[in-house]
A protein has these predicted regions:
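Intrinsically disordered, low-complexity regulatory regions
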Residues: 1-122
Length: 122
């Protein structure tokens, strides 16, 4: 799946983001999807991310596929707005996701700052 049209502005692939997200979902069980619901929503996300980016694939064609998968999620019990909101939220998070390496570096910096503050008595 590693294609430019599945990457965000930081060059991070949607696949890496989905793996990262699934690790958090397993920890917190925030989303309680069936396999079919997850399939439909993740595919809607995929087409939303790549819409207008894949060579020789019109934006409208990918958005048509997005709608097909949203409709599938609705058939599986989601309200349309609920499915669309989930996809929009995941897309907005993905667009700013800098990858696991950047996330771990940010956590290291925060820990270091906290330790420095403790040493200085803050």
């Amino acid at each position: 799946m590693a294609q430019d049209y599945y990457a965000n502005k930081y060059g991070i692939q949607l696949e890496e983001f989905l793996i990262w997200g699934s690790e958090w979902d397993l920890k917190f069980w925030q989303y309680n999807f069936t396999t079919g619901q997850g399939f439909a929503l993740t595919n809607a996300l995929k087409y939303s991310v790549r819409a207008g980016k894949k060579p020789n694939e019109p934006f409208e064609k990918d958005m048509g596929k997005y709608n097909d998968y949203i409709n599938m999620a609705v058939k599986m019990g989601f309200e349309r707005v609920e499915a669309e909101n989930w996809v929009a939220l995941q897309k907005s998070i993905f667009e700013e996701f800098k990858g696991r390496k950047a996330e771990l570096e940010e956590l290291r910096k925060r820990k270091e700052m906290k330790e420095n503050d403790e040493i200085r008595g803050f």
